[in-house]
C-alpha cells in the first residue's frame, strides 16, 4: 500500500467579516490527497479524517463585527457666543497674519568656542558642538552662518593652561587668541558683528570670575582694573560689542570709561545684567565652582531688576539675561522696565537637554528648538545667544524659500 500527498492552488474564496468591509479573514488552505487501494478500511477512514481537518478555515466562525463610529451628538441650537476665538485660527493664512511674535536669523548671536589648534574637537556634553580651530574650522563655521543670515557671533576662547595666572594677564595680551581671531574675522568678513567676552575666569588658574584674595574672597575692584584692559584690547582688535559677563560691582561704568578714554566710543557694551547662579551652565567645563558671592540667587527677581537698572545707569547698551528659558518672567519684567535692547542667553544646559531628548526620540528636536526660541522672543528678548543659531536659521531660511516660491 502506498500513498502520496501534494499541495495544489486553493480554489476556495477568501472569507471576509462583517459586511465584507473592514475585516479580512484567514485564507483557506487546500490539499489533494491521492490514496491507492487499501486493504484496511480503518486506514482509509483515518485519511478521510486528516483530509477534513486540512480545510478547517472554510468552516471557521466569522470574526466579530467592527464597532461602528460614534455618532456626533445632536444639539438643538449652537451656543450663543458673541465671540469665537477659533474663527481667527481657522486657516494657515489667518494664523500667520495674526501671529504676534516672529523670529528671524537677525535675532541670533552664534556662540563659538575656539582654540589654538587646527583640528575641530567635539564637545562631548554638547552634541553637535565643537571647539573650533581658530583659523580653518572657525572660518568655515562663520561662512555657513552668514549664508543663512546669522551675522553676529560671540567668541569663547580655550586658553592653554600654561598661559593662565592668578591675575589673568593673558586676557589683555594684544596677540592673544581672541584679538588674533577678531582681526582674522574682520579681515575675511568685514560686515560680521563680533561680540567678545570680557571675562576673567578663562584666564585664571582658579577658574573664578575674579582675582581671589588670600582669604578666598573675590577682589572686586582689582579684578575690574584687569577687565578694563581686556575690553580695550578687544576693541583695539576690532570687536563691535564687548560683553561684561562677570557680575562684579561697577564693571560697566569702568569699562565704558576705559573705552571712551581710548577713543572707542562706538564700541557697544552688552552687560550680563542678570546672571543667575544656575546649574545649567558650563557642562563642557571640568570643574564646577561656587560663584554665589557674585552671581544672583535664582530665587530673586527684584535683585535682578536692580542690577539691570544699575548697569543701564552706568552706560550699558544691551542688557543680557542668563539663562533664558528659566528666566522668561525676568525678561518680561525687564522689558517693561527699560527701553534698552534685551538679550537672552540660551545656555549650554538648555541646548544639551533639547539635543539629548531629541537623540533619544523623546521629543521632536526641531519643533522644541523653534518653540523655545519663539518663547524667548515672546517674553521680550530682542537678541538670543543660542547654540541653535545655525540650525534654527537654516530652518527659517527653508521656510522663507517655500513661502516665496508659492
Swiss-Prot record:
Under catalytic activity, the entry for this protein gives: 2 5-aminolevulinate = porphobilinogen + 2 H2O + H(+)
Residues annotated to bind 5-aminolevulinate 2? 348, 387
Positions contributing to 5-aminolevulinate 1 binding? 285, 291
> Subcellular localization, per the record?
Plastid, Chloroplast
The record's listing under Pfam families reads: ALAD (PF00490)
Question: Is the Plastid keyword given for this protein?
Answer: yes
GO molecular-function term, one example from the UniProt record:
porphobilinogen synthase activity
Recite the UniProt cofactor note for this protein.
Binds 2 magnesium ions per monomer. The first magnesium ion is required for catalysis. The second functions as an allosteric activator.
Q: What is its EC number?
A: 4.2.1.24
What is this protein for, i.e. what is its function? Catalyzes an early step in the biosynthesis of tetrapyrroles. Binds two molecules of 5-aminolevulinate per subunit, each at a distinct site, and catalyzes their condensation to form porphobilinogen.
Q: What is this protein called?
A: Probable delta-aminolevulinic acid dehydratase 2, chloroplastic
Amino acid at each position: 500500500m502506498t500513498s502520496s500527498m501534494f499541495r495544489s492552488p486553493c480554489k476556495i474564496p477568501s472569507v471576509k467579516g462583517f459586511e465584507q468591509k473592514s475585516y479580512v479573514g484567514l485564507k483557506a488552505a487546500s490539499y489533494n490527497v491521492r490514496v491507492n487501494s487499501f486493504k484496511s478500511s480503518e486506514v482509509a477512514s483515518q485519511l478521510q479524517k486528516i483530509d477534513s481537518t486540512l480545510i478547517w478555515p472554510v468552516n471557521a466562525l466569522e470574526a466579530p463585527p467592527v464597532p461602528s463610529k460614534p455618532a456626533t451628538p445632536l444639539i438643538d441650537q449652537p451656543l450663543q457666543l458673541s465671540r469665537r476665538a477659533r474663527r481667527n485660527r481657522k486657516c494657515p493664512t489667518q494664523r500667520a497674519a495674526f501671529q504676534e511674535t516672529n523670529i528671524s536669523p537677525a535675532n541670533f548671536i552664534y556662540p563659538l568656542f575656539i582654540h589654538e589648534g587646527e583640528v575641530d574637537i567635539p564637545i562631548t556634553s554638547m552634541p553637535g558642538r565643537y571647539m573650533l580651530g581658530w583659523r580653518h574650522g572657525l572660518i568655515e563655521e562663520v561662512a555657513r552662518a552668514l549664508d543663512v543670515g546669522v551675522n553676529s557671533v560671540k567668541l569663547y576662547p580655550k586658553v592653554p593652561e600654561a598661559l593662565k595666572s592668578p591675575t589673568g594677564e593673558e586676557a589683555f595680551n594684544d596677540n592673544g587668541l581672541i584679538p588674533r581671531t577678531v582681526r582674522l574675522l574682520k579681515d575675511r568678513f568685514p560686515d560680521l558683528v563680533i561680540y567678545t567676552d570680557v571675562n576673567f575666569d578663562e584666564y585664571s588658574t582658579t577658574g573664578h570670575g575674579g582675582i581671589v584674595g588670600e582669604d578666598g574672597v573675590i577682589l572686586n575692584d582689582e579684578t575690574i582694573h584687569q577687565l578694563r584692559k581686556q575690553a580695550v584690547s578687544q576693541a583695539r582688535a576690532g570687536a563691535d560689542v564687548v560683553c561684561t559677563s562677570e557680575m562684579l560691582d561697577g564693571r560697566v561704568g569702568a569699562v565704558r570709561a576705559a573705552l571712551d578714554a581710548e577713543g572707542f566710543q562706538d564700541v557697544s557694551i552688552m552687560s550680563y545684567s542678570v546672571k543667575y547662579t544656575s546649574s545649567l551652565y558650563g557642562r563642557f567645563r571640568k570643574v564646577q565652582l561656587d560663584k554665589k558671592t557674585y552671581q544672583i540667587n535664582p530665587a530673586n527677581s527684584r535683585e535682578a531688576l536692580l542690577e539691570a537698572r544699575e548697569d543701564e545707569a552706568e552706560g550699558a547698551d544691551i542688557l543680557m539675561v542668563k539663562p533664558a528659558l528659566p528666566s522668561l518672567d525676568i525678561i518680561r519684567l525687564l522689558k517693561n522696565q527699560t527701553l534698552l535692547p534685551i538679550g537672552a542667553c540660551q545656555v549650554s544646559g538648555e541646548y544639551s537637554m533639547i539635543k539629548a531628548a531629541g537623540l533619544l526620540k523623546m521629543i521632536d528636536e526641531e519643533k522644541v528648538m523653534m518653540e523655545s526660541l519663539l518663547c524667548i522672543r515672546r517674553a521680550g528678548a530682542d537678541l538670543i545667544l543660542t547654540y541653535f543659531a545655525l540650525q534654527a536659521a537654516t530652518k527659517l531660511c527653508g521656510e522663507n524659500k517655500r513661502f516665496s516660491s508659492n
